[in-house]
Amino acid sequence: MDEEYIALLDRAYKLVAPKAQRRAEIPKIEVQNMPRKTVIPNFGQIAKRLNRDIYFMAKFFQRELAVPGTVEGDVFTLHGEKSPKVVEAVYERFIRYYVVCPVCNSIDTELRREGRIYVMRCLACGASTPVKPL
């Protein structure tokens, strides 16, 4: 009975593991500097991939970088020059605070507002964690 169980468990892991690894890929952010502004052309695609509202992400970037910005379609424009390294650091901070599950480290999460607080619920392990409000 134990050998049969182990064989079934191995089979299940082989079927499930590749999907979980593929899901854990965090998209790269593209940063383009222009005179007096910084453009992120793949911002909407990142928001969809991370299952986050594009305006919520934009608000986080604006507050962290202390510059105004606009969202036009999938493109996010910051009205001020910021180096790509600084923008990437803010992106990593956003992922750490608002995307990655602190229990299982999965990015398969959703963010909901319950009253005055935001709650991040992991779709992989089911954990609910309150996060900092913006």
UniProtKB/Swiss-Prot annotation:
SMART domains assigned to the protein according to its UniProt record, in alphabetical order: eIF2B_5
Family: Belongs to the eIF-2-beta/eIF-5 family.
Protein name in the entry: Translation initiation factor 2 subunit beta
Its biological purpose: eIF-2 functions in the early steps of protein synthesis by forming a ternary complex with GTP and initiator tRNA.
Keywords from the named record: Initiation factor, Protein biosynthesis
Keyword Protein biosynthesis: yes
SUPFAM superfamilies: Translation initiation factor 2 beta, aIF2beta, N-terminal domain, Zinc-binding domain of translation initiation factor 2 beta
Gene Ontology molecular function: translation initiation factor activity
